[in-house]
Amino acid sequence: FMSTQRTADLIIGGFKDEMTARRKYDLKDSSGKILATLYFPPITRFDRQKAQQLAGTDEALTISTQLLCKVAQKEDGTPAFDMSDAPMLQRQIPEKVLNDIELFMMDIEVDISKAKNE
């Protein structure tokens, strides 16, 4: 009988598969050559809170790069970045590149054509 199960347990159980699925991102240079392949597990609220604590600010762009360094993985599951890489990434690569990776990480679909028409 299902009603004895806690609602939180039902929800957690319902998303178990999603929590173990990683999404793959090929980071390419301007000529289309793959520089690195990053893997992203789903981001939890806890991940975001930890990144915010590490960033020491409410500034969204700082937090998202901290989050990137915290959650991005190599194929074998090891971290793709060190936490100390965040400031370097923010200073030394084009904003568009960092933005694209972070939008993918957050699983945010950006429809450019629609955005331009609004």
Report the location of each language-model feature.
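Low-complexity intrinsically disordered segments
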Residues: 1-17
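Alpha-helical interaction segments
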Residues: 5, 15, 29-30, 94
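Compositionally biased, low-complexity repeat tracts
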Residues: 9-10, 28, 73
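Short secondary-structure capping micro-motifs at structural edges
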Residues: 11-12, 22-25, 51-57
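A short, compositionally biased
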Residues: 15-23, 65-67
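Short acidic-hydrophobic surface loop/beta-edge motif
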Residues: 20-33
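Short, surface-exposed, charged amphipathic helix/loop patches that serve as local interaction elements
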Residues: 31-118
